Amino acid sequence: DGIDPDCCRNVVIANCIVSTGDDAIVVKSTGPMSRRYGVCENITITNCVLHSRDSALKIGTETHGTIRNVTLSDCIIDRCSRAVGIWVRDGGTVEDIHIHHLTGSTLRYADRYAEPGAPGWWGKGEPIFISATPRKNSRTKTGTIRNVTFDNLSITCESCAFLAGEPESCLRDIRIRDLHMTFKRQGTQPGGLFDEQPSVRHVYSHAIPALYARSVKQLTVQDSTVRYADKSEAWASEVTTLEDCTESAVDLKKIQ
């Protein structure tokens, strides 16, 4: 990783170029640090260039305590596996997260499992990824994600905006405005996969819409578009797929 605020308060990361193999910036709440220092809050990230073979900004997956009041703004996402990824896995709450004015690209990188110790990258080129799903073999309550906003994002991508909870841990109050996605093949890897690592669902085949939402309450998408610069069998014909979503209003248009 590049920079990892773990159970920190009142942090400003500004005017940085972060280039990493793993995640560029990770905001998290590990078990020992959560017990010692408590809430992770008031984290501002602005005016940065972020390059990673995983997420540009990752919140989680270690979420033993509360993470709140995190902003990411005015940044360039430079060829990352994901632009923004938010996970809960360990019973904590992630809330009041605000992302705005990002531009750049996301793509799927090749995994190298054949080489001992080589990484398997998380992410398949998603501009937005939010996940509240249990870890494999975990008996811990998953946790809560609520009050997350995205505003003014322009991303060339290889996969969808992915929002996924479970019936017992639904995402709440997710608002997206002025998200503009251009689907374009940039790497060499095939698509058609959803990647929910680390979780009981793991990685599995699925046609890729522009927006996928599962178990979300109060989802709002406004003034957003998707354009397909390339053709791929992995990309679904429908723009949106909603499963078990309530109180949702989605305005996402396909443009030429």
Protein language model features and the residues they cover:
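Extracellular/periplasmic carbohydrate-active domains that bind, remodel
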Residues: 1-256
